């Protein structure tokens, strides 16, 4: 890596740490959403740096849909135990009782009930007035126009036409009772920045990001990993292929990519050559045109 790249990463690091500290100082009850992916790993690492040698003055929270990869849950529990942090795990029990799932109800219904409604339940239950998320502007077009401090009304809705100006590094965190802010410290990072920072800082990540022989089936041009017995195969026979994941979510809704990149330098080299978005493997993004923006308007992160 060049000195210029290191300087660029350090500038991003400083900006993110400033945002995290600003929120901790300004809000009464913040929380950090921990989705266990690479962006969450970087955001958590930055939070640990921001308050070192102390611990972050806010809990982590994972909205568990019940369909995450098994390796993700194992990694989550190991990291929280290792760092000695408070973790809140919330699940939409109404959705569980109704048997809501991606195979039985489809990706849109599953995402709305188990993720969006589950998140809103948790924010209301604990009274959080600010929630950190690991979204980046380069990921998807609706996220590209979102502010670092993203205002949400009392129903947790986002109005893209009613956003506050953000001049330089000045953020407006004023909220009334019941309103909240979603905060995105990684807004100005790219996928390549994330991977180079993970390499530079030796940040632990879920092994699913590295290429390995895994059982997959191909559906509508997408490779889906068979992670447990709940996946209906309909006569399909899983193939063992060398795949990895560029993004992680519920396993039935997350496509793998064929890859031989089994180390961080190999992943970085792959990122330098790729021309496709990391979210091409997220099936929820393909529900309909503009589906991510519509989800965010209803409270999705």
Swiss-Prot record:
Pathway: Sulfur metabolism; hydrogen sulfide biosynthesis; sulfite from sulfate: step 1/3. CDD domains: Sulfate_adenylyltransferase_2. Residues 279-301 are annotated as: Disordered. Its EC number is 2.7.7.4. InterPro entries: PAPS_reduct_dom (IPR002500), Rossmann-like_a/b/a_fold (IPR014729), SO4_adenylTrfase_ssu (IPR011784), Sulfate_adenylyltrnsfr_sub2 (IPR050128). It is an enzyme of class 2 (transferase). It catalyses: sulfate + ATP + H(+) = adenosine 5'-phosphosulfate + diphosphate. Pfam families: PAPS_reduct (PF01507). Keywords: ATP-binding, Nucleotide-binding, Nucleotidyltransferase, Transferase. GO terms for biological process: hydrogen sulfide biosynthetic process; sulfate assimilation. One of its GO terms (molecular function) is ATP binding. PANTHER family: SULFATE ADENYLYLTRANSFERASE SUBUNIT 2 (PTHR43196:SF1). With CysN forms the ATP sulfurylase (ATPS) that catalyzes the adenylation of sulfate producing adenosine 5'-phosphosulfate (APS) and diphosphate, the first enzymatic step in sulfur assimilation pathway. APS synthesis involves the formation of a high-energy phosphoric-sulfuric acid anhydride bond driven by GTP hydrolysis by CysN coupled to ATP hydrolysis by CysD. Belongs to the PAPS reductase family. CysD subfamily. Heterodimer composed of CysD, the smaller subunit, and CysN. This is Sulfate adenylyltransferase subunit 2. The gene is cysD.
